[in-house]
Amino acid sequence: NHTSGLPTTPNGNFRTEYTDDELLGIIYKLDLNFDAGSRWRFSYCNYIVLGFLIKRITGEYYADFVTERLFRPLGMQTAQPIDDMAIIPNRAAGYDIREGKPRNAQWISATANSTADGSLYLSALDYAAWGADLLGRKAVKAESWAAISQPARLASGRIYPYGFGWFQG
């Protein structure tokens, strides 16, 4: 819940391919921004580490894990990890503003698209399926929703209104 102290990004080059061990090694060598549990600060590194934990515990990469446990049970037909090389009909691509003009977003490495910090394609219908499940709460166990809905408690006792991936309130 972003109380680890890990920096926001791993400071790597997102256009360079890394092995899992190389990327984890980059994160391992980073200095913490603060002592774990003392503050809250959003960090993509937390999600990258989460992806490695999912792989270590389940033997599955994040995208495979969420496909089997979330996308398929909810009937999300197009949800998939980002693959810049795949031909996806009607795909909406990202844009950057450079020199005041919109341009196609620059390619980033497949490594950056394989971690648990996002990097998914979903259609509007898939988002609707996800939203409907949020209301009905069928695909995610009740105890998981209970954990998700708990705000972060810092070592000082202060509460920060963010659960596991969700702002509270």
Language-model features: where?
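Short, surface-exposed loop or secondary-structure junction motifs
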Residues: 1-169
